[in-house]
Amino acid sequence: MEHSREFPIGQLCRVLGVSRSGFYAWRQRPRSARDQESLTLVARIRAVHRESRGIYGSPRVYRALRAAGYAIGKHRVARLMRLEGLRGRAARRFRFIATRRSADLPAAPNRVARHFHAAAPNRLWLADITQVRTREGWLFLAIILDVFSRRIVGWATSARPEQTVALEALHIAVARRRPEAGLVHHSDRGGSYGCANYQELLDQHGIVCSMSRPGNCLDNAPAESFFHSLKTEWLYHFILYSRVQARSCVFEYIEGFYNRTRLHSALGYRSPEQYEKLVVT
């Protein structure tokens, strides 16, 4: 009985209209097989919820349990989580901000046209930049996302909105993945992507440049979706006092959680790393 530690047994028996002997007989009765199973499931549900940093709600907890071999229905998972007071992190409202085009820089055509599909890794990369607010000021985050697995293959941060932060993210992605010529790189028309240094690096590796239409963030929707997840699942739940703290939080989310373990609905509820291992090997 869940309130037996808060109130005297006699008081509980009077409120519930049962005798003391009946209460003790009920408490000493051996648990049923389903009760034992529920205890085991609750322990595993708590573990999955904890491993997700408290992010997963019942749909993703259910998928994680099924992947681990547990024969359980999604409604039972939702009920057990509700009884245990477990819930996913509610997403805050997220506002998309269009990047202004640098009028003096050339723009590549939109070769993607919102067809965010790739048959293999390193066929289509998406690049984007966002701002993270801290008490110290803005932190600028640049990412490279592989559309095939939604994996973040390169990222970098800077205290200032310099072109070098996007260039550093691209350098990291190229060094990690070593893509073959013909890879399509899609971004907005911001100056960070149209500048000479960035375009030279793309040309050096035979990477084909593609750019969104002016002021249309949906032309780069998966990258925007990643920023939404990063902020609503993670960053918005912290008070970020400094850029160093913010960068540490970004590192933990991308390298410790998102790439390795976060279940992605577009990947059949697998993580980017799991999906690449499953499909490529």
Locations of the language-model features?
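Charged DNA-binding/catalytic regions of mobile-element recombinases
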Residues: 1-281
